[in-house]
From Swiss-Prot:
Gene Ontology MF terms in the entry: 3'-5'-RNA exonuclease activity; tRNA binding; tRNA nucleotidyltransferase activity
Name of encoding gene: rph
CDD domains linked to this entry: RNase_PH_bact (cd11362)
Organism: Shouchella clausii (strain KSM-K16) (Alkalihalobacillus clausii)
Keywords: Nucleotidyltransferase, RNA-binding, rRNA processing, Transferase, tRNA processing, tRNA-binding
Name of the protein described by the UniProt record: Ribonuclease PH
Its biological purpose: Phosphorolytic 3'-5' exoribonuclease that plays an important role in tRNA 3'-end maturation. Removes nucleotide residues following the 3'-CCA terminus of tRNAs; can also add nucleotides to the ends of RNA molecules by using nucleoside diphosphates as substrates, but this may not be physiologically important. Probably plays a role in initiation of 16S rRNA degradation (leading to ribosome degradation) during starvation.
Amino acids binding phosphate: R86, G124, T125, R126
Keyword RNA-binding assigned: yes
Domain of life: Bacteria
InterPro entries named in the record: ExoRNase_PH_dom1 (IPR001247), ExoRNase_PH_dom2 (IPR015847), ExoRNase_PH_dom2_sf (IPR036345), PNPase/RNase_PH_dom_sf (IPR027408), Ribosomal_Su5_D2-typ_SF (IPR020568), RNase_PH (IPR050080), RNase_PH_bac-type (IPR002381), RNase_PH_CS (IPR018336)
Pfam families noted in UniProt: RNase_PH, RNase_PH_C
Record-stated family: Belongs to the RNase PH family.
Quaternary structure annotation from Swiss-Prot or TrEMBL: Homohexameric ring arranged as a trimer of dimers.
Amino acid sequence: MRQDGRKQNQLREVEIIPHFTKHAEGSVLISVGDTKVICTASIENRVPPFLRGQNKGWLAAEYSMLPRATGQRTIREAAKGKLSGRTMEIQRLIGRALRAVVDLEKLGEKTIWIDCDVIQADGGTRTASITGAYVALVLAVQKAFAEKTISAWPITDFLAAISVGILPEEGAVCDLCYSEDSQAKVDMNIVQTGSGDFVEVQGSGEEAVYTRSELNELLDLAAEGIDQLIHIQRPFLGEAASWIEEKKGT
């Protein structure tokens, strides 16, 4: 039994509040246990210089944490004048993950900006960001599609992310909170599509090694958890869920 009483394969409580902000084309507040992230998707009618004239779009992501999202206040990175390596790694991960399920050529010369702002952190902020940002992305694209500013549906599959790990006593578990993550022997972040294909597998041992069979067990736990997360996402996608289902795996 885990510290909070969950089973090995049990997610924390997940809540998604759509249209959480007024101005963004798509937005959600996602809560995964005590981790809370505001995710917005904004559409701009321009692309980076390297894509100009190619009639192809782009998707990029930014990630940040409020100073008191954690137990001790941290200095804003804007005040430091530079992003930390962790922040750069996470926002690149979010961008890569979402681009994997977007046909960029169908965006035209548009950029979709994903912003993930952690307002409270208790482990799994990057995976919660991806899961929430996907819903915000679909809401934004659905709005643009209805307004005919995007002429062809570009999102090709469902997407979610989860953490898994190996704890000293409990063994393999999914969706680690901070106290579990801080003592995990092995920690992984998995991003997977609704078709079951992997987008990203980030994993490492902490003064420990793990076997191929343990890796397989972690991947199976992640796949089960991601299926549950996609099931939670779907009601918020509206009619777009059926369009994505048609395109899934194509």
